[in-house]
């Protein structure tokens, strides 16, 4: 059977074969103890010492999301779909697996040549959406794109949440945002400017 990762965090090295963590901290990524040095900010200099990028997360990749390629992967002979979930919370696993289950069920219903490998049907009492779970932005990870800039997340290694709008005005006591998302007391908000967060 052909297995393919379809969703989750990406390693700037070959996952499970990065030695940066072990060299700098003694924690082996090969044993599930990655210190995630790729998620730290770095400053990039050219050969003359001129700063090209300052305090950017230059090695931090977006998360893989191959929702749009799911049917093409099945057509290519993939029979095992993998979701990266190491150290993820239960809500993440529930949401993301439900998302892909719904997508697969829709394909199976439309394409009778595909046969389920198991019996039964799963019902969900929520609307799964990977944008609602922790993510660093999504990329199909060079599956369909040749633009390598679409795979990195240099401004932050954190989950940015949903886009809520554009800051229109800032005063000493308030911030005015033009957007369509409803906000509630206690919601966390990230601000991005021209140089990142």
Residues of each region from the PLM?
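Surface-exposed amphipathic alpha-helical tracts and adjacent flexible/coil segments at the periphery
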Residues: 1-197
């Amino acid at each position: 059977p052909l297995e393919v990762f379809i969703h989750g965090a990406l390693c700037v090295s070959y996952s499970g074969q990065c030695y940066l963590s072990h060299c700098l901290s003694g924690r082996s990524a090969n044993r599930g103890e990655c210190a995630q040095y790729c998620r730290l900010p770095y400053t990039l200099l050219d050969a003359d010492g001129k700063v090209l990028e300052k305090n950017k997360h230059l090695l931090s990749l977006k998360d893989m999301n191959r929702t749009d390629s799911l049917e093409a992967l099945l057509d290519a002979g993939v029979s095992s779909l993998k979701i990266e979930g190491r150290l993820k919370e239960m809500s993440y696993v529930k949401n993301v697996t439900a998302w892909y289950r719904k997508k697969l069920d829709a394909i199976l219903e439309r394409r009778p040549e595909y046969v389920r490998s198991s019996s039964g049907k799963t019902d969900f009492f929520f609307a799964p959406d990977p944008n609602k779970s922790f993510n660093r932005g999504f990329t199909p990870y060079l599956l369909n794109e040749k633009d390598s800039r679409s795979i990195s997340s240099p401004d932050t290694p954190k989950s940015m949440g949903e886009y809520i709008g554009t800051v229109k005005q800032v005063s000493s006591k308030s911030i005015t945002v033009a957007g369509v998302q409803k906000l509630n007391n206690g919601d966390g908000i990230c601000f991005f400017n021209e140089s990142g967060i």
